[in-house]
A protein has these predicted regions:
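Basic/polar N-terminal segments that are highly enriched at the extreme N-terminus
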Residues: 1-4, 662-664, 755
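Glycoside hydrolase catalytic-domain context in secreted enzymes
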Residues: 1-628, 643-648, 652
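Short, solvent-exposed helix-helix connector turns and helix-capping sites enriched
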Residues: 79, 125, 208, 418, ...
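Generic non-transmembrane alpha-helical segments
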Residues: 135, 139, 691-695, 749
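Terminal connector regions
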Residues: 624-667
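Low-complexity, Pro/Ser/Thr- and charge-rich linker/hinge segments at domain boundaries
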Residues: 664-684
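Conserved, compact domain cores that house catalytic/ligand-binding motifs in diverse enzymes
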Residues: 677-744
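Globin-like tetrapyrrole-binding proteins
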Residues: 746-755
Length: 755
């Protein structure tokens, strides 16, 4: 249906326009009945609906809905199509419930494993997070329901999240904390974006024109409206001017009155207010038009089945020394409260009132497996009961295998607070160690929203991470443990050996007012690889019950130029006896030496399904953007000319093929040549390298105290290192041919070379 929104806005009073820019309550926008402006209903959350029960006044009492795998699990699938399928199922439920916008996905970068909301977020890597977000958004919006991608931007902790400032360089912001949002906006155009509580470089996100207008709308061409996180508005008038359209929930009219007063006083332009109202009404009427079509039939039972299927794809087999899959008919004891009452979702705004929850124990019994159960430790407490502890150890010793279901209780990680350590409850660690001592076939199944320290990792036979797999997690665990399904998940985040190894250990969570992002772009695997640090399990890691080999990696060209592209091809073969899925990961390494960069960065990935003996060729296309970093001097992305390595592999530390490509570009970084410009800087620039080498050759003995001829100067390692940091004026000081009267002509020659 056609709606002339600008004409409608022209008929609104100033007070009505201000009122439309805030919520009517927790979940609805305001109406203007005289002009036929309807309400828009929004609902949490990213992995299932938390929709207020219309029979209850309590905004936290929600209707029954299906809990799908949380963001931490979806990310482990490395499969944007899986994210799309989850989104589509949530979108169908939203349509049936009358929801116009789903408040998700949540895609903040996992800067530290301690962040209490990491279970809701996707990854430490912006490429992975962005591709999954785009898939999810496309899925939800394919059902005629909008999304609200959140939390924009740099909301990476819960401590003081409503006021702390995330302080970082522009390069760090652009390379790590914004790209996932950019990918999602450009590939899927979410109907709305939710701004975060925090400040970014001392400016509240809700008041940042740079974020909400300059970057989001001007650079990325975002077409929807921006809403606040619940209670995130600091200065409503500044927010409207910056590009914050909708305040949620409403302020009881307080902020509406401030908008009216500011317009009347001339401190806020009515044109800015009109833009906000137009953007809101575009989505309000779009949602109303979609809702006018017949809604799909609500099928919670079918969606539960989908949730369980998705959970199988998201589980990560971290290690396996031959015990998995469990042998059919073997005598197995399940230990741990999570076997009976799994932790399948996180706490906070995304908490879902589920229709049912499968447990691994229930599913094993329903399939007639030879499984016994001993609690060993409770699911929700760090508590050791000696009798139960000893029963578990005894049962493990008598079984063919012991499967311990461990993980973090909700009291350990949730929205609203951060963890202070990475440890599992001591009752769990102690029991795992004791069981492993008496049973060589010990398997640990982890239910957690974020990495944990695993001091017993070398003592157990296998570790299967289910993350927070949704209400079907028990069915998924059962299928994976017993070989009815093959694990294909990969880690979307590095699992460090200990908390002290993490990139922001000294700066998380900050002093309360400011959080210094001193690690810069070295987040996650970028940090561990740059420091060559051992980790427990690397980014991208995940095992299978089958095997894969890579062959015939090749480039379509050995070099390419700005504006062109190059294709990368590699064949992958399943060499095992079971169908499986391999995640081919492509990393880029900058060999130009132009600036400090991580040793490698994920740029592409694809999940490939292969039958036993089947081989498929996968292909990636690379452009200059895939080689680029954000150059603050240029104020834009930049790929330096020179050599780049293309790495293809199974994880960030399991590379199967390395290729080399050269890149050329007419673009150059600004190069100001003066007396203090170093020999090293001039030698690395292909426009000045030959000139400076000639000068060095002429300088000869003067630079080395008579110990080396001019022809040897560049090959002497000690001298080369000294010269690398020597300024041009140093040649003068050593009495070379560029002495006093020659420095000016030399500068002119060098400057002319870079014009």
């Amino acid at each position: 249906m056609e709606h002339n929104i600008p004409e409608l806005v022209a008929q609104l009073t100033l007070e009505e326009k201000a009122g439309l820019c805030s919520g009517a309550d927790f979940w609805h926008t305001k109406t203007v009945e005289r002009l036929g402006i309807p309400t828009l209903m929004v609902s949490d959350g990213p992995h299932g609906l938390r929709t207020q029960d219309p029979e209850r006044d309590d905004p936290n009492h929600s209707r029954k809905a299906v809990c799908f795998p949380a963001g931490c699990s979806v990310a482990a699938s490395f499969d944007p199509d899986l994210a799309r399928r989850e989104g589509a199922a949530i979108g169908r439920e939203a349509r049936a419930f009358g929801v116009g916008v789903v408040l998700g996905p949540a895609i903040n970068i996992k800067r530290s494993p301690l962040c209490g909301r990491n279970f809701e977020y996707y990854s430490e890597d912006p490429v992975l997070a962005g591709e999954l977000a785009a898939g999810y958004i496309n899925g939800v919006q394919s059902q005629g329901v909008g999304t609200s991608i959140k939390h924009f931007a740099a909301n990476n902790q819960e401590y003081r999240r409503m006021s702390a400032s995330s302080d970082m360089t522009e390069r760090t912001l652009r390379e790590i904390y914004l790209p996932a949002f950019e990918t999602a906006v450009k590939k899927s155009q979410p109907w709305t974006v939710m701004c975060s509580y925090n400040r970014v470089n001392d400016v509240f996100a809700s008041e940042s024109r740079m974020l909400l207008t300059d970057i989001l709308r001007t650079e990325w061409n975002f077409k929807g409206f921006v809403m606040s996180d619940w209670g995130a508005v600091a200065d409503r008038v500044k927010g409207v001017a910056a590009g914050l359209d909708l305040e949620m929930p409403g302020s009881g009219g307080v902020n509406d009155a401030k908008i009216v007063a500011a317009v009347k006083a001339g401190t806020l332009s009515e044109a800015a207010l009109n833009k906000a109202v137009i953007r809101i009404l575009n989505i309000v009427f779009r949602a109303a038009d979609e809702a006018a079509a017949p809604a799909p039939e609500l099928d919670l039972k079918g969606d539960h089945t989908i949730a369980a299927e998705l959970a199988k794809e998201c589980a990560v087999l971290l290690q396996n020394r031959g015990v998995l899959p469990l042998k059919k008919g073997s005598k197995v004891v399940y230990i741990g409260g999570f076997a009976k009452t799994p932790r399948y979702q996180g706490g906070g705004s995304s908490h879902i009132n589920t229709i049912r929850v499968d447990s691994a124990l229930e599913m094993a019994e329903s399939h007639g497996r030879r499984v016994s159960y001993v609690e060993g430790f409770p699911a929700d407490l760090d508590q050791r009961e000696e009798e139960e502890f000893l029963r578990a150890v005894s049962a493990a010793a008598e079984a063919d295998a012991a499967v311990i279901f461990a993980g973090l209780p909700e009291s350990f990680e949730s929205e609203g607070f951060d963890r202070s350590h990475m440890r599992l409850p001591e009752s769990q660690n102690n029991l795992i160690a004791r069981v492993a001592a008496v049973q060589k076939n010990t398997v640990v199944v982890l239910h957690t929203g974020s990495p944990v320290e695993c001091p017993w990792a070398n003592d157990v036979n296998a570790v299967l991470c289910m993350y927070l797999g949704g209400e079907g997690v028990g069915a998924a665990a059962d299928a994976l443990l017993w070989g009815d399904a093959n694990p294909s998940g990969r880690l979307p985040e590095t699992w460090p050996l200990r908390l002290e190894d993490t990139p922001c250990y000294l700066d998380f969570p900050g002093d309360g007012r400011h959080v210094e992002y001193r690690e810069g772009v070295y987040v996650g695997y970028r940090w561990y690889d740059a420091r060559k640090m051992p980790v427990l399990w690397p980014f991208g890691h995940g095992l299978s019950y089958t095997g894969f080999v890579y062959r015939n990696a090749q480039l379509t060209a050995d070099e390419f130029a700005e504006g062109d592209s190059v294709r990368v091809r590699v064949s992958v073969k399943n060499v095992g006896m079971m169908p499986g899925k391999e995640v081919v990961q492509l990393y880029v390494a900058d060999c130009t030496g132009t600036t400090g960069r991580p040793p490698k960065e994920l740029r592409k990935f694809v999940k490939v399904k292969l039958e036993p003996g089947e081989e498929k060729q996968v292909e990636f296309t690379l452009t200059a953007q895939d080689l680029s970093y954000y150059d603050e001097t240029l104020g834009s992305w930049y790929a330096a000319p020179g050599e780049y390595k293309i790495l293809l592999g199974h994880s960030s530390r399991d590379i199967h093929a390395t290729l080399s490509v050269r890149f050329s570009t007419p673009r150059r970084r600004p190069f100001v040549i003066a007396e203090n410009t170093t020999i090293g800087e001039l030698s690395k620039d292909d426009r000045t390298a030959a000139i400076i080498q000639q000068v060095l050759a002429q300088a000869g003995n003067a630079l080395t105290g008579g110990n080396a001829g001019g022809s040897e100067i560049a090959s002497s390692e000690a001298v080369a290192q000294m010269l690398d940091s020597m300024p041009l004026r140093g040649i003068v000081n050593f009495g070379g041919p560029a002495a006093a009267g020659m420095i000016t002509p030399l500068l002119e020659i060098l400057r002319a070379a870079i014009q």
